[in-house]
Amino acid sequence: MAVAFNRDKPHCNIGTIGHVDHGKTSLATAITIVSSELSGGAVKVKNYDEIDSAPEERARGITIQTAHVEFISKKRHYALVDCPGHVDYIKNMITGASQTDGLILVVSGVDGVMPQTREHVLLAKQVGVPSIIVCINKIDQADPELLELIEMEVRELLTKYDFPGDTVPIIRCSALKAINGDSDAKKGILELMDSIDDYIPQPTRVLDQPFLMPIEDVFSILGRGTVVTGRIERGVIKVGDEVEIVGLRSTQKTICTGVEMFKKELDQGQAGDNVGILLRGIKREDVERGQVLAKPGTITPHCSFEAEVYVLTKEEGGRHTPFFQNYRPQFYCRTTDVTGEIALLSGKEMVMPGDHATLSVNLVAPIAMDQGLSFAIREGGKTIGAGKVSKIIK
């Protein structure tokens, strides 16, 4: 039987980003250790292997699926998403990062800014992450003079992508020493936690709108049924509520029979919570990532829409050349990515990098959609544009 979840502190979702092997997962472990001590054991210490949990990850020592870790600071309760650092798994980072309230950029004090450091900051900008804080890790192995240069380089990088590089807090840590019990290193982790409390604003949660949760993952729990996980985008869900599963296939109705967060039971889940929702009478194969769970009748699946789109320039990491009628990139919406064909409107022959354009899009599969839905457009492993649904056609 799961224990009840204590909601006496506001909940906030943050993530770690940064180059592979710069210590993102070790930092997550160190934070759980310090938080467990701070909270009198209310937070479970997660060791590296528990966070880096998929078998192929452990073999390669690389985080693939975004892992969620819980911690409590002096002011808030957090879900920490350990965003993947390997270039093949950028797709997961997009869905992980786009659902966070802020990010910790982890940079090794030995290596400094690396190609993926740049790529992740660019992605954070593209998916609209509101704030970033910096952790310079591995300071026990680094040259102090080099650390000053790395700080300058990180500030320049953040400024380049429109984050406030001059004022962003940069905290120096040694996650590994903190894990091994070094008291000074633990103070560095505590300083990082305090900075997150103070610098990342508590987001306003949309509680008064109809319930909606994009599905990130699906599990089958023996004897209990099917659980879908994700971050609640808006509204509230209570045990016993009727919900619909919308998008990608025919809409299905079911009942929520349980809500859990970090293996603790909730009487209700609300906007901003990372939860698992138990569904009555739904088989594991009846539901998939990319669908949404929603209050019945509040959202419908669509394939065709018009959108206002901004196409990234080459300097922003986008295309070097224009695209034409019938261009077929991928559209990333919430937790799904679907191929769509673009029709250019008002007699346009092409769309150039840097253009703002109104386009008509026809997706190969229907997704849960309402007016104003944001999406990223990607092709060949890079983001080439961003847009919003302005009109639903069918």
UniProtKB/Swiss-Prot annotation:
GTP binds at residues 18-25, 82-86, 137-140. Residues 174-176 are annotated as: G5. Residues 82-85 are annotated as: G3. It comes from the Bacteria. Its EC number is 3.6.5.3. Residues 9-204 form the tr-type G domain. Mg(2+) binds at T25. Residues 61-65 are annotated as: G2. Residues 18-25 are annotated as: G1. InterPro entries: EF-Tu_GTP-bd, EF-Tu_GTPase, EFTu-like_2, EFTU_2, G_TR_CS, P-loop_NTPase, Small_GTP-bd, T_Tr_GTP-bd_dom. Residues 137-140 are annotated as: G4. It catalyses: GTP + H2O = GDP + phosphate + H(+). It holds the Pfam family GTP_EFTU_D3. It is found in: Cytoplasm. GO terms for molecular function: GTP binding; GTPase activity; guanosine tetraphosphate binding; translation elongation factor activity. Keywords: Cytoplasm, Elongation factor, GTP-binding, Hydrolase, Magnesium, Metal-binding, Nucleotide-binding, Protein biosynthesis. Its main location: cytoplasm. It is an enzyme of class 3 (hydrolase). One of its GO terms (cellular component) is cytoplasm. Monomer. Belongs to the TRAFAC class translation factor GTPase superfamily. Classic translation factor GTPase family. EF-Tu/EF-1A subfamily. GTP hydrolase that promotes the GTP-dependent binding of aminoacyl-tRNA to the A-site of ribosomes during protein biosynthesis. This is Elongation factor Tu 2. It comes from Orientia tsutsugamushi (strain Boryong) (Rickettsia tsutsugamushi).
